[in-house]
Amino acid sequence: MPALLAHPDWETPAPFVIWLHGRTVNKELDPGRYLRWVRAGIGAVAIDLPGHGERLDPAYHSPAKTLDMLTQVVGEIDEVLDALAAPEYGEVFDQERPAIGGMSAGGMATLRRLCDPHPFVCAAVEGTTGDLGALYAGSPERPWPVTHDPARVAAVDPARHLDGFRPIPLLALHATGDQMVPIAGMQGFLEALRERYRHQGADPAMIELRTFTDTGAPQEHAGFGRYGNDAKNAQVEFLVRHLRPAPPAAG
């Protein structure tokens, strides 16, 4: 599977993040994100979503193929973990400290994967939702342009699989005026998830939501515009706090 790999030194075991980009872009988008992680002592493992980047199939750039894309990539995440444990990498990707994250469609896949047994220590998503039923039902803020089979939506909808969601630290970043993925759906999902944490005896404060208003980003959806630096700093701080990387050696 095509992947962009980055590591603080390629010698010392380091925690890492599997990152899933959004629809219509590719794994090379936003290299500054990966550079920040590496400088903080965290490895980056960014993969192309099905039909994107080096796996190009233009049909997968259409909203009509989103469910196919999500279904496929959720099933591929364990393949990525297995590949990183191969001898050729010399154990530099610490299998005891993996994290996962994604933006928009990549965040949806991230949240669905977390509803099944997994090894991840923490997760970070942005501009996404865990309530696909609400997203595809449309809303005054964002009527969805494609009608999907409700049964297929339910299969990949994190909100329909919360019973399997093991409490871990979760950071969600969102623009309050997001026109593609309205924040209301994510707020409702996170509240349901907090209740799930409570029932499991976990602290609901493990779930963090950071919002940004009037970012200036296209459709208030991608990159957080004038707050992009703040968003990236918040994400790095969260990852460092929970993955406990060793800072790269000076020089």
What is each of the regions a protein language model found here?
Residues 13-22:
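Short beta-strand element of the alpha/beta-hydrolase
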Residues 50-71, 136:
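Cap/lid segment of the alpha/beta-hydrolase catalytic domain
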Residues 89-104:
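Alpha/beta-hydrolase fold nucleophile elbow
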